[in-house]
């Protein structure tokens, strides 16, 4: 079965839910630590997605600059 890749938006929603639950102060210390750990993992996924997008933009920008160079 193919693995479904998560979108930036879906990961961000999960992270927002974790933050909201931690803000409510209703979690035990153990659950707060688990939530924090999950939040860090989600942040790392978001950073990875953003870094990949940044690299794609750099490549596209560099290719675009080469394609549109006008010789004087």
UniProtKB/Swiss-Prot annotation:
<protein>
    <recommendedName>
        <fullName>Exodeoxyribonuclease 7 small subunit</fullName>
        <ecNumber>3.1.11.6</ecNumber>
    </recommendedName>
</protein>
<comment type="subunit">
    <text>Heterooligomer composed of large and small subunits.</text>
</comment>
<dbReference type="InterPro" id="IPR037004">
    <property type="entry name" value="Exonuc_VII_ssu_sf"/>
</dbReference>
<dbReference type="GO" id="GO:0005829">
    <property type="term" value="C:cytosol"/>
</dbReference>
<dbReference type="GO" id="GO:0009318">
    <property type="term" value="C:exodeoxyribonuclease VII complex"/>
</dbReference>
<keyword id="KW-0378">Hydrolase</keyword>
<dbReference type="GO" id="GO:0008855">
    <property type="term" value="F:exodeoxyribonuclease VII activity"/>
</dbReference>
<dbReference type="Pfam" id="PF02609">
    <property type="entry name" value="Exonuc_VII_S"/>
</dbReference>
<comment type="similarity">
    <text>Belongs to the XseB family.</text>
</comment>
<keyword id="KW-0269">Exonuclease</keyword>
<keyword id="KW-0963">Cytoplasm</keyword>
<dbReference type="GO" id="GO:0006308">
    <property type="term" value="P:DNA catabolic process"/>
</dbReference>
<comment type="function">
    <text>Bidirectionally degrades single-stranded DNA into large acid-insoluble oligonucleotides, which are then degraded further into small acid-soluble oligonucleotides.</text>
</comment>
<dbReference type="InterPro" id="IPR003761">
    <property type="entry name" value="Exonuc_VII_S"/>
</dbReference>
<keyword id="KW-0540">Nuclease</keyword>
